[in-house]
Amino acid sequence: MKKDYFEKFILQNIKKNIIPKNKKILITGSNGFIGRYLVYVLANIFKSHNNLIYGIDINKNLNFSKNYIYLKKDLTLLKKRHLPSIKFDYVIHLAGIPSPVYYKKFPLKTIYLNAELSRELMEISKKHRSNFTYFSSSEIYGNPGKENIPTRENYNGNVSSIGDRSCYDESKRLGETFTYIYKNNYNLNAKIIRPFNFY
């Protein structure tokens, strides 16, 4: 997608009033497929909103603008005490290992990023009263039968807890459970986004 077309599409389809202003925003997985676009939208297209964007990713990232701070970190090697000690207004958790090749190779890191790190970020968000967004996956539905395609949002899923894919599917489900608990039991302003495939 060409840069100018992308910017035009965003400006035509996203209302400016839904983008926050003068906020500190943490994005994990900031150089992933979704993360880099989100950073670009917030830091460049809506740079007049004067948000300060912090991006954490293991991979090298380009500094899009002066209001973007890139932190090169491997989140699988960190505990919450090593996360930025900044009071963020928004925490958007995108970091993960979505590729079957890699999550089969690194199942425990996959579980950590999807579930355990999610909980640590929710604890930080609860303490600072941040808004928290958890990026889940359509994989939480598993393999729905024909009668459940197209799949309804309230479909409980057909997922095996044992198998090569289970480390990803089940940890995403647990991440959603943590989000539900923190929202309903601890009044965390939390949301779940459950994307299907992106192109």
Question: Model-flagged regions — what are they?
Answer:
Residues M1-I25:
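Non-catalytic terminal and boundary segments that flank Rossmann-like NAD(P)-dependent oxidoreductase
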Residues I162-K191:
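Active-site Tyr-X1-5-Lys
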